[in-house]
């Protein structure tokens, strides 16, 4: 089963949940998760928790334990917060390049599903009649301890946007589209290195070419160790074809390490 994860402590999450139930024919069944009703349509279920999702390590196991459902992928419907309060629709995989300040474990990465996140970007960009930014975010926050692929899809970046009905509709429609299509999509898969948190060059590449990114390690996470880059490749559900480097947006030692790893593994090295 494909899982859409929502939480009562997040206005954007509840907005998206409401639009999914209203617009896509989800029906309440007899199951409960964390004491909350489960909604199902075909092979997709909507689950709701009462806590912040970024701290929910082992969520996939909790789902199976409480409901008997074995998730194949988890889409976290969430808010995005930023000091700039930039109106945005974003997607990313979770994990920590360094210390676990906001959930997960230190230097631990969740399993990325690049095709799902690329489809999310493309669909949100297509539906975006709000004039908001649509972009990847770099890999950050938890949960990192999940045994199935997952991604966050977010409405940002202040309460005004979190409760925006149209934003909720866009993200709800995008989630359904992604879950219906990601398994049948073939893209060139890359691990991204460099740039800022909102990964502008990686976002542009994903929107304009066949590249699909999994983990993205921004410049603020550099210097990046070889071990973590190898972990990012390993923690990708699809075969990785390339290592992509935002050249000016990366530190020198990380650039050279990435090039060496690409050569060692026989991957394409893309310098942008």
Curated annotation (Swiss-Prot):
InterPro entries: Deacylase_DtdA_archaea (IPR018033), DtdA (IPR007508)
SUPFAM superfamilies referenced in this protein's UniProt entry, alphabetically: AF0625-like (SSF142535)
One function term, GO molecular function aspect: D-aminoacyl-tRNA deacylase activity
Keyword Ion transport: no
E.C. designation(s): 3.1.1.96
Reaction equation(s) it catalyzes: a D-aminoacyl-tRNA + H2O = a tRNA + a D-alpha-amino acid + H(+); glycyl-tRNA(Ala) + H2O = tRNA(Ala) + glycine + H(+)
One GO biological process term: D-amino acid catabolic process
Cofactor(s) listed: Zn(2+)
Domain of life: Archaea
Family the entry assigns: Belongs to the DtdA deacylase family.
HAMAP family recorded: Deacylase_DtdA
PANTHER family referenced in this protein's UniProt entry, alphabetically: D-AMINOACYL-TRNA DEACYLASE (PTHR34667:SF1)
Job description of the protein: D-aminoacyl-tRNA deacylase with broad substrate specificity. By recycling D-aminoacyl-tRNA to D-amino acids and free tRNA molecules, this enzyme counteracts the toxicity associated with the formation of D-aminoacyl-tRNA entities in vivo.
The protein, known as: D-aminoacyl-tRNA deacylase
Species classification: Archaea, Methanobacteriati, Methanobacteriota, Thermococci, Thermococcales
């Amino acid at each position: 089963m494909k899982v859409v994860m929502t939480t009562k402590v997040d206005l954007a999450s509840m907005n998206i949940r409401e639009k999914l139930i209203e617009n896509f024919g989800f029906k309440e069944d007899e199951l409960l998760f964390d004491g909350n009703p489960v909604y199902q349509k075909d092979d997709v279920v909507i689950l709701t928790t009462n806590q912040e999702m970024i701290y929910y390590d082992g969520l996939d196991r909790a789902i199976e334990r409480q409901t008997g459902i074995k998730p194949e992928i988890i889409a976290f419907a969430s808010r995005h917060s930023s000091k700039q309060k930039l109106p945005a629709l974003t997607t990313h995989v979770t994990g920590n390049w360094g210390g676990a300040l906001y959930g997960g474990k230190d230097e631990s990465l969740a399993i990325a599903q690049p095709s799902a996140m690329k489809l999310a970007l493309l669909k949100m960009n297509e539906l975006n009649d709000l004039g908001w930014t649509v972009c990847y975010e770099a890999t950050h926050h938890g949960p990192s301890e999940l045994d199935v692929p997952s991604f966050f899809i977010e409405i940002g970046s202040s309460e005004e946007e979190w409760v925006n009905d149209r934003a909720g509709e866009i993200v709800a429609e995008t989630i359904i589209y992604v879950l219906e299509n990601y398994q049948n999509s073939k893209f060139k898969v890359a691990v991204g290195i460099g740039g800022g948190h909102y990964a502008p060059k990686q976002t542009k590449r994903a929107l304009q070419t066949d590249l699909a990114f999994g983990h993205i390690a921004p410049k603020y996470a550099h210097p990046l160790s070889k071990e973590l880059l190898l972990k990012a490749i390993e923690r990708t559900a699809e075969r990785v074809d390339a290592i992509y480097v935002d050249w000016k947006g990366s530190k020198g030692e990380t650039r050279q390490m990435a090039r060496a790893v690409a050569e060692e593994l026989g991957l394409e090295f893309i310098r942008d």
